[in-house]
Each structure stands twice: as structure tokens, then as C-alpha cells.
């Protein structure tokens, strides 16, 4: 176009194979990821659609296509565009919380012959931690949700951080400043 802000594809003879109406066209192996108006699609090298336009960031890796949805969930498709997993979890971590108990760590001192000469305690106490009831899972990089001990998803991945503040109490941060306190049932 005249603004030169849209992209298309032409063949070796200069014929338009894909009109210049896309915000971006990214080749990957024998595919193209095309972007238009905040949506993306995957096309074959013959420009046949594998995935229709969707509000997602799409990437191709190995033998699959991963879609990062606007709600921070991940979906996985095969290279024929068939949905393999509609809720992909990239990582699961246990959560630890500080108890009321504190500990002082000590270091033992020995002489050259290996005889104990004394112990020194660190000045700063360390809070004793225990494992919380729930776990946190990660979908899109940096977005977390709560998961039950048995692996059931409790909340969608709408938090930028989750910290256990008790055995079954969690501070779920929606940004650097705001958050909400939830229990293991997500309320």
C-alpha cells in the first residue's frame, strides 16, 4: 500500500500470492504466521490456512503450533490444525509459606586436627517454612494460577505472582501493586 505498513507475498514473476493487507508475515519452516488487526493465522507454504485467524500469539516449534491466548492460557495444535491440548500448562511449582517458628543457623568450628572448637550462631533468624496445600502452575510465561494437590486447576492463569501466606491461604497478585487473597478453593 502507499503507507508501506502492510505486507504481502509475491512470486518470482511479481504476481501477488498474498495481498499486502497483513501487519506481519513470519516464515517458519514450511509455514507462515500472518498477523492482521491483532489476530494471527497459520498458512502452509501453498498459502492454505491451517488455523483460522484468532486473537492469539501463534508460534511453530517442532511438530506443533502453540497459541498464547489473550487470557494467558496456552493451546497446542498439530501441524494439521487439530487441537491437541486446549489448556497447556508449562510448569508446576510447590509453594512454601513461613511459619511462626524461627531458626538460627549455626556453623561448627574445627581446629587443624579436626577437633570441634566451638559453634557460632548467625545473628539473623531464618523463618521455618512448610509446604502449602496448593501448588501454582504457569501457562503463558509469567502468568500463574492455583492448582489443587491432586492437579485440578482452581483459578485461571490471571496472576503475575502467587505467594503462599499460610497452609491454605495465597496472595495472588494481578500486577506489581494489586492482588487478592484466596484460599485453596479459589475464594
Language-model segment annotations:
Residues 1-187:
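Residue-level detector of conserved, function-critical positions
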Amino acid at each position: 500500500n502507499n503507507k508501506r505498513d502492510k505486507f504481502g507475498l509475491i512470486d518470482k514473476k511479481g504476481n501477488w500470492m498474498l495481498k499486502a493487507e497483513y501487519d506481519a508475515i513470519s516464515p517458519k519452516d514450511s509455514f507462515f504466521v500472518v498477523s492482521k488487526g491483532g489476530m494471527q493465522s497459520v498458512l502452509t507454504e501453498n498459502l492454505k490456512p491451517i488455523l483460522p485467524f484468532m486473537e492469539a500469539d501463534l508460534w511453530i516449534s517442532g511438530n506443533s503450533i502453540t497459541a498464547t491466548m489473550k487470557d494467558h492460557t496456552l493451546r497446542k495444535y498439530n501441524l494439521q490444525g487439530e487441537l491437541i491440548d486446549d489448556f497447556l500448562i508449562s510448569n508446576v511449582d510447590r509453594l512454601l509459606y513461613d511459619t511462626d517458628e524461627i531458626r538460627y543457623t549455626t556453623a561448627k568450628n574445627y581446629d587443624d586436627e579436626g577437633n570441634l572448637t566451638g559453634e557460632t550462631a548467625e545473628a539473623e533468624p531464618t523463618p521455618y517454612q512448610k509446604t502449602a496445600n496448593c501448588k501454582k502452575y504457569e501457562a503463558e510465561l509469567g502468568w500463574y494460577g492455583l492448582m489443587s494437590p491432586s492437579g485440578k486447576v482452581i483459578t485461571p492463569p490471571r496472576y503475575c505472582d502467587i505467594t503462599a501466606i499460610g497452609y491454605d491461604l495465597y496472595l495472588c497478585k494481578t500486577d506489581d501493586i494489586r492482588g487478592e487473597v484466596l484460599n485453596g478453593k479459589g475464594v
